[in-house]
Design a protein with these regions (language model features):
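Hydrophobic h-region of N-terminal signal peptides that target proteins for export
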Residues: 9-18
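Bacterial N-terminal signal peptides that target proteins for export
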Residues: 1-6
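Noncatalytic scaffold domains of N-terminal-nucleophile
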Residues: 21-56, 68-69, 73-233, 238-240, ...
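Long, structured ligand/cofactor-binding scaffold of large enzymes
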Residues: 60-62
Length: 262
């Protein structure tokens, strides 16, 4: 987990229609100057995220008659594929929404510290903060909340089933997508330190002995399978099934604290 993901949904509870010929999204993502300080206005609905592919997923959901929460959850799962730096299902976040009756609700599904976490677990033997422990080790991982938060929001405020809104993310994971500047830069800057230590991650995000570059295709078959399980069985597939077993085993093997009980 590199950073947290925050997804906001506005004006939930009503269906949106999108203009027949909306302007095409800019072919850039965050970190590129061209997508900064260029406001866009819309009357019926709007989707914004850190990644253009994920944003298009949300727009498609609105076009199909979904509401803002349907779109937000679809975007959240799409970001789990297209923005692995922060949008992954191993993380957590927040959702703030305003229903058509004017009520504002906040859903907190931020990661929680595992039960075995202690106050001093990020200190070295001399009692000094150890940034590697707190940022890149298995100790740095909190119990994920994204899958539970998405499901809660969709159940209470959405209009579409999970199997439908998660489907675009599954397709992106299985078929892959072209790595953009932002992802390539982050894989080089952040991933070069962490990813080589984990063979499974290296097999996904590296090619020919180095991080994927802009223009390479990123395919995540295993993530697609995990998302398919969630689509079929809901959040229990993540927190109680084989996925939970694999997370717990990985943590135990590498000194992490998350257990299946968490």
């Amino acid at each position: 987990i590199w950073r947290q993901v925050v997804i906001a949904a506005l004006l939930a509870g009503g269906s949106f229609t999108v203009a027949a010929n909306p302007p095409p999204p800019p072919p850039v993502s965050y970190g590129v100057e061209e997508d900064v300080f260029h406001p866009v206005r819309a009357r019926q609905g709007m989707v914004a995220s850190v990644d253009a592919l994920a944003t298009r997923v949300g727009v498609d959901i609105l076009r199909q008659g979904g509401n803002a929460v349907d779109a937000a959850v679809a975007v959240g799962y799409a970001l789990a594929v297209t923005h692995p730096q922060a949008g992954n299902i191993g993380g957590g976040g927040f959702m703030m929404l305003r229903t058509k009756d004017g009520k504002t609700t906040a859903i907190d599904f931020r990661e929680m510290a595992p039960e075995q976490a202690t106050r001093d677990m990020f200190l070295d033997d001399q009692g000094n903060p150890d940034s590697k422990k707190s940022l890149t080790s298995h100790l740095a991982s909190g119990t994920p909340g994204s899958v539970a938060g998405f499901s809660l929001a969709l159940e209470k405020y959405g209009t579409m089933p999970l199997n439908k809104v998660i489907r675009p993310a599954i397709k992106l994971a299985e078929e892959g997508f072209i790595v953009n500047d932002a992802l390539a830069d982050d894989l080089k800057t952040y991933g070069s330190e962490v990813i080589p230590q984990h063979e499974n991650s290296k097999a996904i995000f590296w090619k020919n002995g180095e991080p994927l570059k802009k223009g390479d295709r990123l395919v995540q078959k295993n993530l697609g399978k995990s998302l398919e399980l969630i689509a079929e069985r809901g959040p229990d597939a993540f927190y109680k099934g084989a996925i939970a077993d694999q997370i717990a085993n990985e943590m135990k093997k590498h000194g992490g604290l998350i257990t299946k009980a968490d």
